[in-house]
């Protein structure tokens, strides 16, 4: 056969194959069009966090015995515990406790191993600031309880995500 005719036949086959691939992609796109959206409108809708969510650490100053277990179990030696030994009663007195959440990896080891349960994980995960030095929380900032998402009337909470079918 003539080379021009065979090239034209190959061109036709390639065109049909390309149209088939485009059609298959279009069918997949149309099958996803009737599904519910997966995203939520973040500032106005928030998911309720799970029971064991590891958010910001809450600290209770009165319960702390300055044993420094939290510092020893932390993989990055993050909590700063300042204490003074009271010689008359032979006990440590806690002076200062701080955690830098810019460095914290939220592993929860400090909460898990604390013998007096003065540390706990909260639901708070919005810790963004414009200055990284504001992420260094002292015992006063760590002692504040976060506002619960459930109690905030300006935010619509979503109890659970719709199941995603694959």
From Swiss-Prot:
Compartments it resides in: Plastid, Chloroplast thylakoid membrane
Reactions mediated catalytically: a plastoquinone + NADH + (n+1) H(+)(in) = a plastoquinol + NAD(+) + n H(+)(out); a plastoquinone + NADPH + (n+1) H(+)(in) = a plastoquinol + NADP(+) + n H(+)(out)
Membrane association type: Peripheral membrane protein
Protein name: NAD(P)H-quinone oxidoreductase subunit I, chloroplastic
Superkingdom of origin organism: Eukaryota
Annotated positions binding [4Fe-4S] cluster 2: 74, 104, 107, 110
One GO location term (cellular component): chloroplast thylakoid membrane
Main location: plastid
UniProt EC number: 7.1.1.-
PROSITE patterns documented for this protein: 4FE4S_FER_1, 4FE4S_FER_2
Biological processes, Gene Ontology terms: photosynthesis, light reaction
Biological source species: Stevia rebaudiana
Cofactor(s) for this UniProt protein: [4Fe-4S] cluster
């Amino acid at each position: 056969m003539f080379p021009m005719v065979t090239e034209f036949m190959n061109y036709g086959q390639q065109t049909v194959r390309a149209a088939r691939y485009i059609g298959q992609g279009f069918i997949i796109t149309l099958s996803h069009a009737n599904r519910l959206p997966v995203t939520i409108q973040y500032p106005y809708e928030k998911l309720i966090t799970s029971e064991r969510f590891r958010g910001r650490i809450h600290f209770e100053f009165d319960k702390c015995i300055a044993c420094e277990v939290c510092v020893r179990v932390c993989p990055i030696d993050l909590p700063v515990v300042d204490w003074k030994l009271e010689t008359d009663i032979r006990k440590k007195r806690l002076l200062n406790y701080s955690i830098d959440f810019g460095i914290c990896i939220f592993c929860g080891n400090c909460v898990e191993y604390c013998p007096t349960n003065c540390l706990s994980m909260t639901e708070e995960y919005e810790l963004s600031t414009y200055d990284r030095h504001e992420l260094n929380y002292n015992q006063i900032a760590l002692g504040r309880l976060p506002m619960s998402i459930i109690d905030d009337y300006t935010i619509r909470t979503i109890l659970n995500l719709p199941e995603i079918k694959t």
